[in-house]
Amino acid sequence: MTTSTGFDNNAYNLPALRLSDVPNPAQTRVVVGMSGGVDSSVSAVLLQQAGFQVEGLFMKNWEEDDGTEYCTAMEDLADAQAVCDKIGINLHTANFAMEYWDRVFEHFLAEYQAGRTPNPDILCNKEIKFKAFLDYAVTLGADYIATGHYTRRSVNYTREDGLEVAHLMRGLDNNKDQSYFLHAVGGDKIAKTLFPVGELEKPEVRRIAEEHDLITAKKKDSTGICFIGERRFKDFLQQYLPAKPGNIVTDDGITIGKHDGLMYYTLGQRGGIGIGGVKDRPEEPWFVLQKDLSNNELIVGQGHDHPMLLSQRLTAYKLDWVERIAPAAIFSEQGLKCMAKTRYRQPDQSCTVFADSDDGSRVKVIFDEPQRAVTPGQSAVFYIGEVCLGGGVIESFE
């Protein structure tokens, strides 16, 4: 990984790109990732209204069985086709299930086996939606791809080495901003992507869908991990990883129950632990404080802000900087002063980032205030103003 030169915060003052800023839309072909949801549907409408040559692509990323997931996928494809028919554009389909299994799902299982809590959506965006999809769209003659993500991007700029890139920016709707999930996508890929709904708030997106009588106008937003569907997470994971039950132990060493397997729990979790009333303990909620892999014990304690859940430092690795260049400031004695999120929708947290490797692919982060339930396997994502700098996988905390 290369390090940047002359880094300063002014480098992130480029304006957001609007559809009207793209020259010659009538000669510009855009392939939209059509998920069968309202956001991608409206993205296609907005691109069409702006005068682009628009086509759709439905991605099949998981080989479903004949159960609920299969029915949901078929419904999504039917809805995507109905929207494309309604607005008069072609819909292509592509099967990326093999790529998804190799690049995303196997990593997902390995992380759970190692006792961490991964976020497969981040890897899916990096490896599938902005790699496999982008590559496929290019074979269709696309100048850009587009998605229904609530995020924005800057105008393109050229790095010193000649690579054309763009900044990833927060979506205008703070409640829906998805830049956290896109932080691992390189700026060269962002430069080839349009985010039509990034400038809108969700109610406006639904209003546009209703105005155009789209079948997806009132469709419920999808939640959770795409390949799990409506199944219980525990039931799904048991199909692929053997459960290893063990003891539930209090923070002062008392065994008070049995857990079903450490992979089913995450730090800070309150519900679903299976602890009833405990003798000589107050009637207060119990929280997961630690997963002791060496002894296969789930450590629990009482108190939402238990000291074991609070930390002010973390180490992150596998850093993906959007610019594909680590900011020079992380190599300085002062470090990089910025904001961070250690989970989706967390309010910005002020911190300082220091390089922990020669190439900036590993960092130490010191927060101004203690953080609750920092979770290994999740991502720490960094921001300056509206711009998402990138992020990495949380390895440890203290």
UniProtKB/Swiss-Prot annotation:
- For this entry, the protein name equals tRNA-specific 2-thiouridylase MnmA
Q: Among its keywords, does the record have Cytoplasm?
A: yes
Q: What is its main location?
A: cytoplasm
In residue numbers, the region (Interaction with tRNA) covers 176-178, 343-344
Tell me, what is one Gene Ontology molecular-function annotation carried by this entry? ATP binding
Q: Which SUPFAM superfamilies match?
A: Adenine nucleotide alpha hydrolases-like
Biological processes annotated in GO:
tRNA wobble position uridine thiolation
Query: Which residues of the sequence carry a binding annotation for ATP?
Result: G33, M34, S35, G36, G37, V38, D39, S40, M59, G148
The protein's UniProt keywords, in alphabetical order, are: ATP-binding, Cytoplasm, Disulfide bond, Nucleotide-binding, RNA-binding, Transferase, tRNA processing, tRNA-binding
Segments carrying the region annotation (Interaction with target base in tRNA) are 119-121
Organism of origin is Psychrobacter sp. (strain PRwf-1)
Signal sequence region = none
Where is the protein found, in the record's own terms? Cytoplasm
